[in-house]
Design a protein with these regions (language model features):
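N-terminal amphipathic/basic-hydrophobic helices that include classical n-h-c signal peptides
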Residues: 1-13
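Bacterial N-terminal signal peptides that target proteins for export
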Residues: 11-21
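C-terminal motif of bacterial Sec signal peptides marking the signal peptidase cleavage site
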Residues: 29-32
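N-terminal Sec/ER secretory leader and immediately downstream segment
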Residues: 34-136
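Mature extracellular/secreted ectodomains of secretory-pathway proteins
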Residues: 90-220, 238-239
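Short, low-complexity, Pro/Ser/Thr/Gly-rich segments in the mature regions of secreted, periplasmic
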Residues: 234-250
């Protein structure tokens, strides 16, 4: 009798293991290698699915951090358009919400003809290039967003088989700081800032941008530390003079 129960228990455990492996394979092959970004969805409001069984605690933490990053970027894009209405007029959509939607609510792979298909730090650099005459808010946000998403492996939904590099997350936080410095200091041929963000001289202090960027940096640094601990790989700290700083690899 004991032997029968032992065999039944062994068979049951094997079935559970096979089911778990099937779920992992389903997730792995359904995800493929696509870089396509999906519309935003709050991970705390998702309904239970079979795929949820293949998530660990760290995966849920990653889901939440990515969602927070994209939420902050949406808010930042709206504020920059309000502060720089001339840039909105250069957009094919003379509407803030439509511009935000095409970046964060549509399926795409960050390849926008309007930006000569540039993304990441290349799109950020375009924002501060006199030769570029397009919508600088769009180039800045697409560049920043695609750079940050690349630090998460271009995923918004994580499972046990997914790998995220703490060093890359750390690098992305430093790149945000470099982008912020350029936003506040780089000027065009006429001596004007390429994009206005915080208050100008003789204006009342306006620090909402600093708070948003601070939250973005803190988010990336926090998850970088978490992944450093999980992966047991030390992050190499990098210090640069902002005036001569170069963007770090992602």
């Amino acid at each position: 009798m004991a032997l029968v129960l032992l065999i039944k228990g062994h068979v049951y455990n094997m079935k559970k293991t096979i089911l778990f492996l099937q779920i992992l394979l389903l997730i792995l092959f359904s995800g493929g290698c696509s870089r396509e970004i999906k519309p935003d969805q709050d991970p705390t409001e998702r309904e239970f699915s079979v795929q949820s069984l293949a998530k660990g605690d760290i995966d849920n933490v990653l889901d939440i951090h990515v969602h927070e990053v994209r939420k902050l970027l949406r808010e930042l894009m709206g504020k920059l358009y309000k502060r720089n209405p001339k840039q909105l007029k250069k957009s094919p959509f003379n509407d803030i919400d439509k511009n935000i939607s095409r970046v964060f609510d549509k399926h795409h792979d960050w390849s926008f003809k309007q930006l000569d298909f540039k993304e990441g730090v290349d799109a950020i650099k375009m924002t501060f290039d006199d030769a570029y005459h397009g919508d600088r808010v769009f180039s800045f946000i697409v560049g920043l967003s695609s750079m940050l998403m690349a630090s998460y492996g271009d995923k918004t939904d994580f499972y046990m088989l997914d790998k995220v590099d703490g060093q890359v997350l750390y690098n992305s936080a430093r790149n945000i700081e470099i982008a912020v410095w350029k936003l506040s200091n780089n000027r065009d041929e006429q001596g004007q800032l390429f994009l206005y963000s915080n208050s100008l001289p003789n204006e009342e202090a306006y620090l909402s941008y600093e708070r948003l960027f601070g939250k973005l940096v803190a988010n990336q640094d926090t998850i970088a530390i978490i992944m450093e601990s999980k992966n047991k790989r030390l992050i190499k700290k990098i210090f640069q003079n902002m005036a001569t700083a170069v963007f770090l690899p992602i």
